[in-house]
Amino acid sequence: MAKGQSLQDPFLNALRRERVPVSIYLVNGIKLQGQIESFDQFVILLKNTVSQMVYKHAISTVVPSRPVSHHSNNAGGGSSNYHHGGSAQGSSAPQQDSDDAE
């Protein structure tokens, strides 16, 4: 199972570490926006004005607002499968879109 997450974990960890704003599209078409606070094998904690626990099985696509380097050999990347966010810095929170899926 670790082999299946060899791309997912470094990608999500880079987004978390660099506090990159992301849009997460769910399989039902809903778009969530925020920053990845932490994640594990099954869920992602997405922080905007509140923290939301989003189950990975409900996610279709994760779209970063800017390109990120997510190579697994980055310094400080580590090999842990569980990543927890630190304290949030004083950055402006991304706004949540209320796009209606039609």
From Swiss-Prot:
GO CC terms of this entry: cytosol
Biased composition (Low complexity): 70-86
Keywords (A to Z) from UniProt: RNA-binding, Stress response
Domain Sm residue range list: 9-68
Assembly mode: Homohexamer.
HAMAP family reported for this sequence: Hfq (MF_00436)
This protein's name: RNA-binding protein Hfq
Organism the protein comes from: Klebsiella pneumoniae subsp. pneumoniae (strain ATCC 700721 / MGH 78578)
